[in-house]
Every structure is written in C-alpha cells, then in structure tokens.
C-alpha cells in the first residue's frame, strides 16, 4: 500500500507505527456556518481512505475535530447575539447531518477545541519554559527561529507567503504565529486570560488522542501552510519528533476553473447540492476525481455521476436487494480484491471506478444469458455488499433511490393515480389505464408493472 506524502512529494509505502493499525487525524470544520463543497470533498476523500484501510484488514482509529472557538465564530456571535455554544452546537448538528447524507463513517473521536483548553494551557506553558515562545501585548507567540526545519512540511518560503502570515508589528520573526490571544472574556491561564490559537488547538488534540503515534495527518491542501506547518513546528520543537508519519492532502474544489472560496463569492453550501441530488450521488461524484487533483464542480458532471451510480442501483434492483447496512465487510471476492489492489496505489479511484463499471456491465450480460443461476446471484450479492462498503454507496432503499426529489405530496398524488390505473385495468378500461401512465410519463414519472405490483421512479 502506497500513498503520496505531501512532505516528501512522492509515493511512499505506508508503514504505520503498529502493524495493521492506522491512526488518522483529519482537520475538521470551523463551526460558524454550514458546510460547503470543500468540506464535503475532504470528508469523502478521507472517509474513502478509511474504508480502503478497513477493507484491507487494518484497524483504524479516526479522529476529526471541531474548531469551536475562533475569530469567525466570535464575529458570528456579535452579528447574531447568540452565545458561543448556541452557534457551535447548531452548526455541528447541521454538519453531522450532511456527513450522514454522504455516508461518512462516524469518527472514533470528534474532539472539540473547547474541551481541551486545560491541555492547551499546559502545552503553551511548556513551550514558554523551553524558551520556544514569548509574550507580547496581544498574546503568546511561537518563535519560529528556534525551528531549523520550519517550512519543511510545506516547502514554502517566507517571501511567497506574506499574505498568509499573522500580523503583529512586534513579532520577532515574520513567520512567528500566535499560540494564545489575550482576551479578558475567556479562559484564565498563568500567562494571562485569553483563548488558544488555531494551530495550537489541533496539535494539542492530536497529541492528547494519539500521543506520539499519529500515522496519517489529512486535510485540504489549503491547510498545508500555515496551519499544518505550524502544528508540525510546535510538536517538533517540543517533543523532538515529527507530528505524523504521513501527510495527505486533497486538492481544491473549483467552480468554473476558479478556487471555491467565500471571498470570491463562488462558494455554496453542501445543503444546496443535497436538495438536487441525494448524498450518495454527490459522494460518487466527488470520488470520480483523484483526491490530490483539483476538482472542478460542474452540474453536468454531477448528472453524469448520477447516471453512473444508477447502474449500480439497477443491478441491485434486478436482484431484488434491499438497502445494504454500512458495516465493515470481509473482502473475499476476486472483483473486490482487484479493486482494492488498485486503490492501494494512492487511492486510484478513477481506475477503481472503471473496474466497477466493467463489473456491473459483465454482471448484467451474464444475468441476461443465465437468469436462473442462483449460485451466481448469491455470490453477486456478496460482492455488491463488499463494493458498497469500499465505495460508501448502496445504502439507500432501491425504490427510494429512484424516487429522490419527489415531494411527499407529489408521492401521494402518484400513488392515487396508480390506484386509479389499477382499478381501470381491473375494469378492462385499458384506454384510461394507458392515459394515466402516459400522463405521468409526461411528468417524468415512469410506471413499471412487476410481479409484486406497480413501482414507479423519477426519470432523470
């Protein structure tokens, strides 16, 4: 199993601290607003990584944090008149709803920064004791001149990154960063009341959960500098070892070729996409581009991803399979193992999805020729369950999948028309029955007569 290490800039064999055990930390959201597509991509990419490791026989401990104290949250407090907890709890709940829609496995740890304040204070006290930090009027800062390997993680240079550095005229070095911001409204500490800086929040949560055994630190490429650089700097100088064995980063999400960002005004919320397509379609779409590549969002590509996922559900429907349960599955089929082998090369999702397409097509051809082969159908069901777990798809009831986007009121109206059609057929009024079917077809509602009754689905 190899992954592209963002620090070494090459593919490296994955060697964890302990054999067949992977400890992963993913930088989560700052909870002051709803999740956007950038959050979705990072979550899907590294949930996929987690699934591949689990399917490959690894024990995985996965942590994804919440930054629940931050300048953006404080600004939201001022604008809304709500408390810190009211805002953060509200957006955490909404974020987790979005993650469930995307079939993101529940993290083993979901640390909130505010739950680790005491550990952060102790951490900063140690940095001061080691003369790695210093005090200014507005807070405590890390002295980056004490780190001979600063810029090791990001491979950046100071001249190219001035715009991303924290401003303070009194800093010893331009690259120095804040560990603690003085503020009388917040937490008491030996060095003065205040609140922690973002970079200290994450490194303390990582060390509290994983000690010195973090195998993979993951996140969006936009976090590489200064956030991940500054996390690593603190750990390296305080503990004399690197924060993580591997650094994995996913590429930007772009809208019409431009990086998605609120400052450019081209950012939109995940919930907006989930109104148009179910979460599995969006997940499948996000997996279609290699995690390290930049992802250009386009509605026509999302629609193409739906048609591709439809084929998976059509095969499930052909076998009369119910919604699968999302649980770890032992990989036994040759098809699943071949796909895993491809994914073990830096999560080569595009090649893996091509193999999935090929498998679905071949399965349909075989079933056309051998419709009564029960042994094949049993094995096919098992393989589909394995693939569902690996890709994180197939957990929606098949009928509901093809009815997505139809309101409850409209569903009731359709069912009433089906009842009228059934009555018309019983009375041998086939003209009326056909008229009802054709009228629904004009509304992109397709009726299908099956041995178990009439089923319907949305066309397109």
Swiss-Prot record:
Residue ranges of the motif 'HIGH' region: 29-39
The EC class name is ligase
Q: What is its EC number?
A: 6.1.1.16
- Its GO CC terms? cytosol
> What residues bind Zn(2+), as annotated?
27, 202, 227, 231
Q: Which cysteines are joined by disulfide bonds?
A: none
The cofactor required is: Zn(2+)
MF terms in GO: ATP binding; cysteine-tRNA ligase activity; zinc ion binding
Binding site residues for ATP: 262
Q: What is its main location?
A: cytoplasm
GO biological process terms held by the UniProt record: cysteinyl-tRNA aminoacylation
Q: Which SUPFAM superfamilies match?
A: Anticodon-binding domain of a subclass of class I aminoacyl-tRNA synthetases, Nucleotidylyl transferase
- InterPro entries given for it? Cys-tRNA-ligase, Cys-tRNA-synt_Ia_DALR, Cys-tRNA/MSH_ligase, Rossmann-like_a/b/a_fold, tRNA-synt_1_cat_dom, tRNAsynth_Ia_anticodon-bd
Spell out the subcellular localization from the entry: Cytoplasm
The listed location of motif 'KMSKS' region is: 259-263
Top-rank taxon of the source lineage equals Bacteria
Keyword annotations of the record:
Aminoacyl-tRNA synthetase, ATP-binding, Cytoplasm, Ligase, Metal-binding, Nucleotide-binding, Protein biosynthesis, Zinc
**What remark does the entry make about the cofactor?**
Binds 1 zinc ion per subunit.
Reaction equation(s) it catalyzes = tRNA(Cys) + L-cysteine + ATP = L-cysteinyl-tRNA(Cys) + AMP + diphosphate
In the record, the note on similarity to other proteins reads: Belongs to the class-I aminoacyl-tRNA synthetase family.
Describe its assembly: Monomer.
- What this protein is called in its record is Cysteine--tRNA ligase
């Amino acid at each position: 199993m190899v992954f592209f290490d963002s620090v070494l800039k090459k593919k490296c064999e994955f060697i964890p601290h302990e054999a067949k055990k992977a400890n992963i930390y993913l930088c989560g959201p700052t909870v002051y607003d709803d999740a956007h597509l950038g959050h979705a991509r990072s979550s899907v990419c590294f949930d996929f990584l987690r699934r591949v490791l689990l399917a490959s026989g690894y024990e995985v401990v996965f942590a994804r944090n919440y930054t629940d104290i931050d300048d953006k949250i404080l600004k939201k407090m001022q604008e809304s008149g709500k408390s810190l907890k009211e805002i953060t709890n509200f957006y955490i709940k909404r974020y987790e709803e979005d993650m469930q829609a995307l079939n993101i496995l529940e993290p083993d740890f979901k640390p909130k920064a505010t739950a680790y304040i005491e550990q952060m204070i102790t951490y900063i006290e140690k940095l001061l004791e080691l003369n790695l930090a210093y005090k200014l009027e507005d807070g405590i800062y890390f002295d980056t001149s004490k780190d001979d390997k600063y810029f090791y993680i990001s491979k950046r240079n100071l001249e190219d990154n001035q715009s991303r550095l924290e401003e303070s005229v009194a800093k010893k070095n331009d690259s120095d960063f804040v560990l603690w911001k003085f503020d009388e409204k917040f937490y008491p500490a030996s060095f003065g009341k205040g609140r922690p800086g973002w970079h200290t929040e994450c490194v303390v949560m990582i060390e509290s959960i994983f000690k010195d055994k973090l195998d993979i630190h993951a996140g969006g490429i936009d976090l590489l500098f200064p956030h991940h650089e500054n996390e690593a700097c603190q750990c390296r100088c305080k503990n004399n070892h690197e924060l993580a064995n591997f650094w994995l980063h996913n590429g930007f999400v772009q809208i019409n070729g431009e990086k998605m960002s609120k400052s450019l005004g081209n950012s939109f919320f995940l919930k907006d996409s989930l109104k148009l397509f179910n979460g599995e379609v969006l997940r499948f779409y996000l997996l279609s581009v290699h995690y390290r590549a930049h992802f250009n969002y386009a509605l026509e590509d999302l629609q193409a991803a739906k048609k591709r996922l439809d084929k998976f559900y059509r095969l499930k429907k052909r076998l009369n399979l119910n919604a699968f349960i999302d649980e770890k599955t032992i990989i036994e089929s040759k098809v699943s193992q071949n796909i895993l082998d491809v994914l073990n090369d830096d999560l080569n999702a595009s090649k893996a999805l091509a193999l999935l397409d090929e498998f679905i097509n071949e399965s349909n051809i075989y079933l056309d020729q051998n419709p009564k082969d029960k042994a094949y159908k049993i094995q096919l069901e098992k393989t589909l369950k394995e693939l569902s777990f690996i890709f994180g798809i197939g957990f929606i009831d098949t009928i509901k999948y093809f009815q997505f986007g139809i309101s409850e009121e409209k569903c009731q109206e359709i069912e009433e028309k089906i009842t009228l059609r059934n009555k018309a057929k019983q009375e041998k009024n086939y003209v009326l029955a056909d008229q009802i079917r054709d009228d629904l077809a004009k509304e992109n509602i397709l009726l299908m007569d099956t041995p178990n009754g009439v089923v319907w689905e949305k066309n397109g």
